[in-house]
């Protein structure tokens, strides 16, 4: 490797990966001003100077049906990327998330003497744990957002570095509620519940009804309570509004385009689907209840595949039931309202418990606030310069 101008390959498959890639390139350029960056990039990575071999949108395929439909094209792209990388011989290949695409590329490149890093651990600790053996063969190192992920890899002697979470870097330890209310143009003197029904159509389909009925029950208990409903895009908004028209036509809601983070900061509590949103709510210091429903067969299979005691990231990080998880038959309006009312009550013990929970959230935030972009770049530098054992 030329110490001053390495060739660094990065492949991102979606918007979140493009954001990570751009942050990583920015940090690497500070150390290697003359480095060349190639791969599959989105607009943010392109703006940082990455040469893209394929439009990132070509890899952004969601859902089994979509994947099957586009499989021949995806396989062709993967074959071309492998061929190009074997010709270019980059000093390191960094697969950013997109494990179904990147791990096969990494496997081939590592076998041909190219250093590989997989950035963002797949949820191998939760399900399909046998993937750990493929990851071990494919990568010189995994970069993990969360400490329990590194602990899992350590058990299998797979090189892994905990770098902290980029979201923990982006959200302040003490979020500014007044500023969030101003952004949303809502009255900070009011009491709010944020309702996040998920970003996927299937989540809205299964969660909108119980979440709306929960809001109705809470409105009876807390007449001054108002509801903030951020929706990820126009498609989800239309879907949600159609369900609301049938279930709760007279319930007043503040429908918001995007801005989920500001809604959670402004709210006194949050009702949400599991996933990254639960981590974001924790970082926003919003007491939450996690609710999730899916098709009975999907749930039957998931129960047998998932190997963790909890499904939400705050509970997984704490390794205890910090926030209620109401799954499948427990995801009812009555139970959700009961759990949320504890956060919304003005009762002295409820207020005290709320403060204790927020302190737990702050402690967990500090644990994963490590300047992830810089940590990721240092891991790449260590691998390139031979200071990391591989």
UniProtKB/Swiss-Prot annotation:
SUPFAM superfamilies: UDP-Glycosyltransferase/glycogen phosphorylase (SSF53756). Disulfide bonds: none annotated. It catalyses: a lipid X + a UDP-2-N,3-O-bis[(3R)-3-hydroxyacyl]-alpha-D-glucosamine = a lipid A disaccharide + UDP + H(+). Coiled coil: none annotated. The keyword Lipid biosynthesis applies. GO terms for cellular component: membrane. It comes from the Bacteria. The keyword Lyase does not apply. GO terms for biological process: lipid A biosynthetic process. Its EC number is 2.4.1.182. Keywords: Glycosyltransferase, Lipid A biosynthesis, Lipid biosynthesis, Lipid metabolism, Transferase. Pathway: Bacterial outer membrane biogenesis; LPS lipid A biosynthesis. GO terms for molecular function: lipid-A-disaccharide synthase activity; phospholipid binding. PANTHER family: LIPID-A-DISACCHARIDE SYNTHASE (PTHR30372), LIPID-A-DISACCHARIDE SYNTHASE, MITOCHONDRIAL-RELATED (PTHR30372:SF4). Condensation of UDP-2,3-diacylglucosamine and 2,3-diacylglucosamine-1-phosphate to form lipid A disaccharide, a precursor of lipid A, a phosphorylated glycolipid that anchors the lipopolysaccharide to the outer membrane of the cell. Belongs to the LpxB family. This is Lipid-A-disaccharide synthase. It comes from Haemophilus influenzae (strain PittEE). The gene is lpxB.
